Structures are given as C-alpha cells and as structure tokens.
Amino acid sequence: MAMASPAIGQRPYPLLLDPEPPRYLQSLSGPELPPPPPDRSSRLCVPAPLSTAPGAREGRSARRAARGNLEPPPRASRPARPLRPGLQQRLRRRPGAPRPRDVRSIFEQPQDPRVPAERGEGHCFAELVLPGGPGWCDLCGREVLRQALRCTNCKFTCHPECRSLIQLDCSQQEGLSRDRPSPESTLTVTFSQNVCKPVEETQRPPTLQEIKQKIDSYNTREKNCLGMKLSEDGTYTGFIKVHLKLRRPVTVPAGIRPQSIYDAIKEVNLAATTDKRTSFYLPLDAIKQLHISSTTTVSEVIQGLLKKFMVVDNPQKFALFKRIHKDGQVLFQKLSIADRPLYLRLLAGPDTEVLSFVLKENETGEVEWDAFSIPELQNFLTILEKEEQDKIQQVQKKYDKFRQKLEEALRESQGKPG
C-alpha cells in the first residue's frame, strides 16, 4: 500500500529541522528574501542538542510560538572604507619580525666550480720609484708615497706589504687575449705611435650665436641620432664616447645585487653597502657612451665612468686624454680636471677620427708637495743632490776615458810618417 504524501502545510512526521519549512514556504509564495547579516546574537547562539523526547518537542514548540517566527531586524553596518590604490598588495609585518629576502636575491648564484680560483700567480714584481709623484695601490686603493712594487708584465702596482695579499693572477698568463681589442673597437683604427703635443693657446669663449651655429653644423654631420640640444639658458647637452685603455686592474665591490631602476633614480650607492672587494681586468679599448652637459668637467666624467662600472678606486688614479689622429700618428694630450669635454667635441665635430677621448691610468700626475712633511722634503733634496753628483761623476769618467784613448793614440803616432 502506497503512502500518500502529506499536503503542503501538514507535519505528519516529527521533523527536527523546523526552521527550513518557513523558508521553503516563502520561496513558493514569493521571491526569496536575502538572509539577514550575522550579528553578535546569532554568532553566540548555541543550538540545542537534537532529541526525540516529547517534552523536548513541546518546549521547542512553545519557544517558537512565543517568538512568533519573527527574526530580529538586521543591524545597520558601517560602510566599508575604500582601499587606496596599491594598499591591497601591501604585506604587514609583525614588529620585530625578520625582514623577508629581496626578490632580486634569487638571481645571485654561487661561484661556478668550473671557474678556477686565482691565487695571485704569474706576477714578476720589481721595485719602482714613481717618477711623477705618488701613485695608487691596485689592491688596497691607498696612496703610494715612497717605495712600491710593480709587475713588469701586467703593471700591477702595490705596496710591499700588500704583495702577499694579492689573489688576482697576472693577465699575461692569458696569452695574447689581453692584447686583443674589444669587439666594439674593431671600428676604430689603432696606431702604435705616441707623440706629445704642445699645449694649445687659450681661446676666447664663443658667443651664444656662435654656439648655436656650431650645434646646427654638428647635428647636420651627425648620422647616429646623437646630436646636441641647446637650452634657453645657453647650455647644451650631448653624447661623448670614451675609450677605456686600462692595463691595471680595477677594484669593485663583491657580492652585491644588480642595480635596479629605483637605485638609479635615487642615486643609491650600492658600493657602500658592503666591505667586500674584488679586482679584475677590464677589456682593452672598451667604449662607454655618456650623456653630459656643456658644464660637465673632466673630473665629473671620470667619476661618472667609475660609477657606471661600480669601481671603488680613487678617481685620482685615472686621467682623461684626448686622442687626435694626424698624418698616421696618434697625438695624446692629458686634459685638465677643469676642461669641458663636450665643448671639445663640439669644436672637433662628430668624427672620432679627428678627436676621441681615452681613459687611462694617471701615471704622469703632478707632485703634490703639500702632502709631504718638512723632513720628507729635506730627504728628497738629499737624494736629488746625491743623484746629481753621481751623474756628474759618470760624465767626468766618460770623458776621462776619451782623453786617455786620444793621448794613447797620439803617443803611438809620434815618430811615424804622416
């Protein structure tokens, strides 16, 4: 015998989930109302345990009748505060919690085991007397005032006490690879002749109209879209190319992350974040392009180049030369730290065969006598006087020998016919 299904509204069975039928009736009678937001009373309400006892059923029916199946009205909630742009991506750290690792640190790889470790081998050091005044140690970066050691092969210069700390091998062990120019230098013609050029006479500064005419003429001859731009205040900007001809090693910080866009904009000095240093040889005749102003001096150009390569050596260790090709010869002239390279570029034109800039070691720097004490200066005078007396004695001995040979020849010729 089939059991007839109960009609809507009848309860022939003792259902315990009594809140559901009213919602079911509401769905049949009209559109379903949205459920009320949970409030504190509903969150703290603990449901009674299920029971089939008649007393429990009657008590539950009485409580439902007293409530009248009325639900409390929803409490007015405060509107959500709108988030500022980029705030949802921000992570909050507990005070004192360790700072997470920089995402760029995942690119730092350990040293390749296939690369052999250098131990400072292959150098042939000899004592050096700096002819042009004090020099710079390639290991510690400090100034060398008196005695120094220099490798006869790679020109590595250091203090005598720094000799045992060198870990960079001599570059001559690599064969002729050190003498080959970099790929960027294949477009330039190199010569082996170096001729000193006399200092040019100072000229009067050009007027604004002359500068404008020279810039227009320069831009018409420039074919690489690297022209100069004139500002309203009379200054102008442009590009120069600097050839790096450094035979001695340079010192850079070790174990730092690459420079980011933020560091470049904020001019963050990453070299100051670590005390670790390492040395290496730059490729010969590498070319670096700089965008400078007409007010940029040679000293600022050198500092900009060192900053681009993250070199921590003293800028006085380097010097900027201008190289001129003329009649198959290469004329080098050291520029003063107050010279304006962009103005020289404007006068010579965009052709690098006429004028080019070279960064080399400052081996012929002027002696800063103010850096020495009185006893040291007196010692220098004593050494110079001794060297002068030695030279005089050598010249005297040389001509004394000539006199003796002439006198012997005259004695032998006496008594002999014609």
Curated annotation (Swiss-Prot):
GO terms for biological process: apoptotic process; lymphocyte proliferation; negative regulation of lymphocyte proliferation; positive regulation of protein ubiquitination; regulation of protein localization to nucleus; signal transduction. Residues 366-413 form the SARAH domain. InterPro entries: C1-like_sf, PE/DAG-bd, RA_dom, RASSF1-6, RASSF5_RA, SARAH_dom, Ubiquitin-like_domsf. Residues 1-118 are annotated as: Disordered. The modification Phosphothreonine is found at residue 352. Residues 274-364 form the Ras-associating domain. The modification Phosphoserine is found at residues 182, 279. It is found in: Cytoplasm; Cytoplasm, Cytoskeleton. Keywords: Acetylation, Apoptosis, Cytoplasm, Cytoskeleton, Metal-binding, Microtubule, Phosphoprotein, Tumor suppressor, Zinc, Zinc-finger. Widely expressed. Frequently down-regulated in lung tumor cell lines and primary lung tumors. One of its GO terms (molecular function) is zinc ion binding. A zinc finger (Phorbol-ester/DAG-type) spans 122-170. GO terms for cellular component: cytoplasm; microtubule; nucleus. Residues 77-89 have a biased composition (Low complexity). Interacts directly with activated HRAS; a RASSF5-STK4/MST1 complex probably associates with activated HRAS. Interacts with KRAS. Probably interacts with Ras-like GTPases RRAS, MRAS, RAP1B, RAP2A and RALA. Interacts with RRAS2. Can self-associate. Interacts with RSSF1 isoform A. The RSSF1 isoform A-RSSF5 heterodimer probably mediates the association of RSSF1 with HRAS. Isoform 2 interacts with activated RAP1A and ITGAL/LFA-1. Binds STK4/MST1, inhibiting STK4/MST1 autoactivation. Potential tumor suppressor. Seems to be involved in lymphocyte adhesion by linking RAP1A activation upon T-cell receptor or chemokine stimulation to integrin activation. Isoform 2 stimulates lymphocyte polarization and the patch-like distribution of ITGAL/LFA-1, resulting in an enhanced adhesion to ICAM1. Together with RAP1A may participate in regulation of microtubule growth. The association of isoform 2 with activated RAP1A is required for directional movement of endothelial cells during wound healing. May be involved in regulation of Ras apoptotic function. This is Ras association domain-containing protein 5.
